[in-house]
């Protein structure tokens, strides 16, 4: 359900763009993201930091787009958000004791430390590449191409990358025999 709530503002943005223009779509994105945030809070009583950062960037860059009537701001939003995510992941990997990926998934998954590092680095590079591709598409191709890329391209490639990471994680999960041996050795 949470993923659906995160996806709704994107659908609203796309529909508003197709029916009206980038400026109405930017305003609709701000409103839909705010509503999604409120619904998430009401349902879960918790909002992830990434969600808050995304909301702040949507409000800032969406508002700048509307105030200055310039679509460059909303186009930069994607690159800046992805850049912030990449930097946060890299800082967690090289400065902190635990990677952000491990902090987010470590309670649900048991993986060797090098696997956490590789996953974290892979996501950082993924966000960096997506941000750079966004710059190219946003500034050298027509606006309609950028909107389709933002809605369908980034969503599709993110789902694909998530699946690839899922397969990678699955390969490194402890098997049932290892789990039962660990449980036996932990018992007095």
Curated annotation (Swiss-Prot):
InterPro entries: YciB. It is a multi-pass membrane protein. It is found in: Cell inner membrane. The chain crosses the membrane at residues 22-42, 50-70, 72-92, 121-141, 149-169. It comes from the Bacteria. Keywords: Cell inner membrane, Cell membrane, Membrane, Transmembrane, Transmembrane helix. One of its GO terms (cellular component) is plasma membrane. HAMAP family: YciB (MF_00189). Belongs to the YciB family. Plays a role in cell envelope biogenesis, maintenance of cell envelope integrity and membrane homeostasis. This is Inner membrane-spanning protein YciB. It comes from Pectobacterium atrosepticum (strain SCRI 1043 / ATCC BAA-672) (Erwinia carotovora subsp. atroseptica). The gene is yciB.
